[in-house]
Every structure is written in structure tokens, then in C-alpha cells.
Amino acid sequence: MTKTLPKDFIFGGATAAYQAEGATHTDGKGPVAWDKYLEDNYWYTAEPASDFYNRYPVDLKLSEEFGVNGIRISIAWSRIFPTGKGEVNPKGVEYYHNLFAECHKRHVEPFVTLHHFDTPEALHSDGDFLNRENIEHFVNYAEFCFKEFSEVNYWTTFNEIGPIGDGQYLVGKFPPGIQYDLAKVFQSHHNMMVSHARAVKLFKDSGYSGEIGVVHALPTKYPFDANNPDDVRAAELEDIIHNKFILDATYLGKYSDKTMEGVNHILEVNGGELDLREEDFAALDAAKDLNDFLGINYYMSDWMQAFDGETEIIHNGKGEKGSSKYQIKGVGRRKAPVDVPKTDWDWIIFPQGLYDQIMRVKADYPNYKKIYITENGLGYKDEFVDNTVYDGGRIDYVKKHLEVISDAISDGANVKGYFMWSLMDVFSWSNGYEKRYGLFYVDFETQERYPKKSAYWYKKVAETQVIE
């Protein structure tokens, strides 16, 4: 049976400042930790990315032509405050006013994120969000943006608090490149959630118009053997690290006893302790019912198996299928069922996981209000032929995920939109330019845009709300 989506459903495309804009030192932009980190550790940099800084009118015109009626944009904190605080950079402010005006001119609603992996270098090198002073700096930056950019109707505080802690302190593929420090992971999650809560409370108390929420990456975690209590426990602990800890903070305003039992076990085995203060929980509690929406980024699920050994994580950054490894002491290891498809980067393709995650939020956090799927898409080494990309695999991937969203809506979940990652090809943080996601192919040499076959398919779905 053909499935449909509601008439008012947003069919969006997603971007991020550092992955799309380029112009990393243009017009007074301050440095971010990624600038030097990429030069020192990778085979690419964020120049020119998709040159969105100059070419946004082209991308927004294409958006309008292809039925894309929402766009995720992030503001580069260091374009507004080059050192994260103090002096404002007027050229950065002007750029975003121009960008939002172009969005509205093209009837593409901007959903604007304040922080998408790009803390200004001056603050990042001072401990980033492990340093509590950064909470104040973020709230001040947020307040400036709320006041200044009153044309924005949809705000999100952070993109993917989970993967930031994970990338910076567990996998170690984000600056500062620290590995296997679970205490830092949880402390980063916690301090960022306090920053989120403080910004949301300020937004509501100040009476700004529009809506505000947060974007969480929520990869669903399953036990490898559902009948083995040790595998079930491994999946629960892995879920706490990546999902439950931050969801509890968002919607309960505290960490449930079960969550803290898991956190304490993980830290007992791996070492370290957390600094959780009364005023933090007061801030979390004050904001727990103020979120207007939850953004869910979903790409994959994982299966967890009980494991007794040392932590070892190998990140597959070059698309060499089967090269990744993930095992955490006292938690478990990832082990996928044989029949589940994977991408070249070992990301497991499992649309049912998105349905399960939506329904989990609905069941466990009934004060969620509404959900947008703020990122979902297929990274691929696209072949450019005949001025397009025949990306049937991507169409199939998006179609199956839209179908489970339709199912979730039928089963009572309030899901209001979907943003494909990504609108156009952008550079990927730890994979460079080979891993493409866009509806529009970008020739990074010439910066020309070419619609892929998926763009034509997406346009039809957006126009008809029929998934076929």
C-alpha cells in the first residue's frame, strides 16, 4: 500500500556552516579548532567546502525549484563573535541577515542552529564545554542571536550533543582528539545540556517569537541476542551513552535512577567522576517542558553484544567496508546481524530503527510535543555521469525512512517534517569530500550544482506527499 505524509509536512534539506560555507577566514570570521585540526590530521580542509557563503542564492533557488520548503542552517559562532565573546563582527551579522532574507524570498523556511560542532578556537582550546565558563559564553551568544535575528521562526540550540562528546573524547576523531575518556563524554553532554536549558529558558522568559528546540542524534541500540540478558544490558548501557542521558536531561530535567546506575557502572569500570551541581538540575528542570520540538538525526542502528575486554575503537573514515571496530570496556561491542545492509563506512541501514526511536520518545517522554527528522540520508561515493548522479540507492534509502515516518504518524507520533542530509554535497567532518549526501551534486573544482536523480524524486514526493 502506498504511504502518504500530511499536507503541512516540511520537506527540507540540511546544511551546516562549517561543512558548507567555506570562507573560513573571510570578513572577520574567527578561527575554530577544526581549522588547524584538519590541517594537522586529515587529507582535506573546509576550504572551499560548497562555497555556500557566496553561493547560497543558487542553492536556495534550486531548493525552491525542487520543492524543498525548509532548510537547516547553522550560524557560525565565530562569524558573530570571532573569539566566542566580546566584540561582535558586523560583517558576520550582515551575512546571516542576507541569508535569511534570501530563504524567505524563496519560500524556504530556515531552521537555524546556534552550534553545529564549531566552538570558536579561543573557547575550544580553553576546555570547550568541559569548562563551565563556556555555558555563560554560549548563553550570551544565544541571547545576541535571538535579539538580532528576529526574522528566524525556528531555533535549535545545539546539533548533536551526543556525537560532540563522542567525537571529542571517545572516538577521538574531533578536536582535541582524546580517546576513551567516558567521564569527559558524560561531562560534555551534561554541560551542553545545561547550556541548552539556560538558552531555552531565556528565550521563553524574554518573550521572543518563534519556536525553540534541540537536535539530538539518536542511533537505535539493539541487543545482538535479545534472549541473552548480557547482550540486553550491553544495549542498555550503549543507549545511555548515546541517547538516554541526553534525552533524560532534555525532557525529565534530571537523570533517572536507571540512567545514573548505568553511568556510575561505566565510570566505575573506566575511571573518572562527574561534576553535577544542584544549580544544573534547577536549570534542566526549568526548561524540560519548554522545548517546542525535538529534532532527531537518524542514520543507523547498532547491535550490541556483551564483551569482556579493553576498549578499542577504529573509525572507518575512508569508506573501506568492514574496517571499523567498536568495543567499550564494561559496556559491550558492536556486532551486526549478517543480513543487515551496511554502507561503505560501515553504517548500518535499518529504517525500522527510526520508527522504534520515534515511538520510544513518544512513550518515554510524553512532553516531547513534536518531532522533526532533522537529518537522514545516505553517504555514497557518487558517480557523476551525464551531468547527474543515478543514485537509486539513495532514493531507496530515503523512501524507506519516509515510509516508517508515515507509519509512526499513523501510530500517533507527532512528526512534522523531514530534512534530508544534505541539501547539496558538503564536506564530511571525518571523511572529507569523497562521502557525498546531497540532493544536488557539487563539482568542488568549479562549484557548479547539478540535481541528482534523487532531487527529481524528492520534488515529486514533496509536491504530492505520496511516497512512491
From Swiss-Prot:
Q: Which domain of life is it from?
A: Bacteria
EC class, as a word, reads hydrolase
Q: Which residues bind D-galactose 6-phosphate?
A: Q19, H116, N159, E160, N297, S428, W429, K435, Y437
Q: Which UniProt keywords apply?
A: Glycosidase, Hydrolase
Q: What is its EC number?
A: 3.2.1.85
Q: Report the catalytic activity.
A: a 6-phospho-beta-D-galactoside + H2O = D-galactose 6-phosphate + an alcohol
Keyword Nucleotide-binding attached: no
Q: Which Pfam families match?
A: Glyco_hydro_1
Q: Which GO cellular component does the record give, naming just one? A: cytosol
Which residues does UniProt mark as catalytic? E160, E375
Report the GO molecular function annotations.
6-phospho-beta-galactosidase activity; beta-glucosidase activity
Q: Which pathway? A: Carbohydrate metabolism; lactose degradation; D-galactose 6-phosphate and beta-D-glucose from lactose 6-phosphate: step 1/1
NCBIfam families cross-referenced by the UniProt entry: lacG, PRK13511.1
Under the heading HAMAP family, the entry gives:
LacG (MF_01574)
- So what family is this one in? Belongs to the glycosyl hydrolase 1 family.
Q: What is this protein called?
A: 6-phospho-beta-galactosidase
Report the source organism.
Streptococcus pyogenes serotype M1
Q: What is the lineage of its organism?
A: Bacteria, Bacillati, Bacillota, Bacilli, Lactobacillales
